[in-house]
Amino acid sequence: MTTSMDFYSNKTFQQSDPFGGELMEALLPFIKSPSNDSSAFAFSLPAPISYGSDLHSFSHHLSPKPVSMKQTGTSAAKPTKLYRGVRQRHWGKWVAEIRLPRNRTRLWLGTFDTAEEAALAYDKAAYKLRGDFARLNFPDLRHNDEYQPLQSSVDAKLEAICQNLAETTQKQVRSTKKSSSRKRSSTVAVKLPEEDYSSAGSSPLLTESYGSGGSSSPLSELTFGDTEEEIQPPWNENALEKYPSYEIDWDSILQCSSLVN
């Protein structure tokens, strides 16, 4: 009975599923009773494939994960420190340049791997051009040996520029001294005639009058008339002809009064 049922089940299973015969042959030793034939048959059937769920899980693993804005802000690189006279090329190198004090043109100092090396090169050139008045990136390292030597061509250009600056400053100092000396000489020449007149003690008109031997000054002759001329009184031209003097003669006045009486 059991053998016939097994044969029937195998035959029907092979008709329904031609590829499951080998699986059933492997499971036959574990079948002990006819009651569990149906359960074994149900167990042997393959489960239907769920393509939708597998596709959803696969796409979930491949999809990009969302990243919050706070995480991007914290993970962003910090900006590098900016130095005077230093700028960065687009390929990552650092360039040092300096402006000349006269014509305000830029002098190229070199290309460096780090910004600190370029800043030190700028400090060396600035200190050579402006001395203690230079604005440096590292003022504490001014008198130390941290400054690396510049290129020979750049150093030669700096020496020539410093020499030209020294010559121009000397010329300006000389021109200012000459202009100040000319001003002083002109002021002394203007003051000399006044000193001559003051040392003489009198004006030229007075000295000429004294040298001619005259007893009176020409100013007195111009302002006063001749005192020797007779002045006729307007009320009586013939009354006092005998007395040309301006003094009063009381005797003549008394005689005239007695004659009138």
UniProtKB/Swiss-Prot annotation:
Stored SUPFAM superfamilies: DNA-binding domain
Biased composition (Low complexity): 205-223
Assembly: Interacts with BTB/POZ-MATH proteins BPM1 and BPM3.
SMART domains reported in the protein's UniProt record: AP2
Coiled-coil portions: none
PANTHER family xref list: ETHYLENE-RESPONSIVE TRANSCRIPTION FACTOR ERF061 (PTHR31657), ETHYLENE-RESPONSIVE TRANSCRIPTION FACTOR RAP2-13 (PTHR31657:SF87)
Keyword DNA-binding: yes
Localization (cell): Nucleus
GO BP annotations listed: ethylene-activated signaling pathway; response to cold; response to fungus; response to osmotic stress; response to water deprivation
A GO-annotated cellular component: nucleus
UniProt superkingdom: Eukaryota
Free-text function comment from the UniProt entry: Probably acts as a transcriptional activator. Binds to the GCC-box pathogenesis-related promoter element. May be involved in the regulation of gene expression by stress factors and by components of stress signal transduction pathways.
DNA-binding interval(s): 82-139
Protein name: Ethylene-responsive transcription factor RAP2-13
InterPro entries cross-referenced by the UniProt entry: AP2/ERF_dom, AP2/ERF_dom_sf, DNA-bd_dom_sf, ERF/AP2-like
Pfam family for this entry, one: AP2
Recorded family membership: Belongs to the AP2/ERF transcription factor family. ERF subfamily.
Stretches with biased composition (Basic residues): 174-185
Keywords, in A-Z order: Activator, DNA-binding, Ethylene signaling pathway, Nucleus, Transcription, Transcription regulation
UniProt GO MF annotations: DNA-binding transcription factor activity; sequence-specific DNA binding; transcription cis-regulatory region binding
Chief location of this protein within or outside the cell: nucleus
Region (Disordered): 169-238
